[in-house]
Amino acid sequence: MHATVKGPLADTVAGATAEAVLRACVHCGMCNAVCPTFQLTGDELDGPRGRIYLMKAALEGEAIGRESQLHLDRCLGCRACESACPSGVEYHRLLDIGRPFVDEHVRRPWRERLTRWAIRWVSTDPSRFRLASALGRAVRPLLPASLRGKLPSPSRGGVGGGRLPAESADGRIPTAGAPSQAPSTPYPLPSAGRGMSLLAGCVQAAAAPQFNAAAARVLARVGVELTETPGAGCCGAVSFHLDAVDEARTLARRNIDAWLAEADAGADAVVITASGCAAFIKDYPDLFAADPAYADKARRIAAMVRDPVEVLEAHPPVAARPPAEPRIAVHEPCTQRHGLKLPGRVGALLARLGFEPQPVRDPHLCCGSAGPYSLTQPTFAAALRANKITALTEHAPAVILTANIGCWMHLAQTSPVPVRHWIEAVDEVT
């Protein structure tokens, strides 16, 4: 596809990136076959090919309207199209340029602006998320369903109800408190050469601290010590996907500086239990491509990112007991399957530990969570969740295991079976 970016992005790093992505597209339309929103509406403009045309027109200087913004807003950013594309079109890189560009030229209604600001304000800081959750519980009956279901509730598997064990003065996460069904298999004590940083996160730190606690216990048993890095916090993904790019960069710089200090002190990697955060941090080099002070730093951090399954493949755990509920359905978040490109890896690890992963129809399709998407596009998100839960529960699993905080909260809202993080299941059998 011929493309020449004009206007403010002409002759910029972002403009050159957009042109390269556009030129790789050959209009074949194979992307539409795997696009969740195209499957819902059948509208060409709600599929990747149509959205590519919209962004191309905008970047080449054609008039931009509210309709273009709406169709881009409906994109989940799931990247299923990238996994299916025979030409290797990196659609998300174009979306990350085109969507903020359109947002700068089309003013949103005030209600949308307020909603998007509120989501960013609440979700990027654990203390604010806890405060908002407490206030929300007080007025739960008055809230719309899309918000009511996100509130922490002990009945949803302890969402927001847990607390991370107290940290030591140096930020080390205690590994005490492992499931007490049986003594754990002994492993070598962590050594200084196998220390890794752990992202505490923002929403997850408030709503599901048990995920990181489980990861710390599991990895300690295979000789890897995790330390939550002082100074690191929200990865910036929510801000970025709500087109607050400068805010996202501010959050990312803080993390980069904190993790580089840890790396210089000997940390081997940055372990991230939320696949959405991991995928975004992997894209830090794009975020800082035009920033000479942080471009190399961002590349260094991106190369250090590890999903827990990658660490456990290198340091395999040993089952100490059979699973209490072996029949499981593994939900692979889009950020893990398409973003981190780790399809099938969690299921394979769990199978080696005695679990019985059941087949899941259309595993490439998004559940509808997609970061803030379930709040900004609740109708689409609810339809996609209903389809995903049907697929996940077709073979009667006892539990659904996922790998991302947003997907966990979104699925648990209506799932007929418990939804947990897969690392918790590993914790219980090792």
Segments (PLM) and residue ranges:
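Generic N-terminal leader/targeting and pre-domain segments
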Residues: M1-C31
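Cysteine-centered iron-sulfur cluster-binding motifs in ferredoxin-type domains/subunits
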Residues: E19-F38, G65-V89, H364
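Alpha-helix capping and helix-loop boundary segments enriched in small/acidic/polar residues
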Residues: R23, G42-D46, S239-D246
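N-terminal glycine-rich anion-binding loops that anchor highly charged ligand groups
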Residues: G29-A33, D43-P48, E225-P230
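Iron-sulfur cluster-binding electron-transfer modules in prokaryotic oxidoreductases
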Residues: Y91-R156, L164-T430
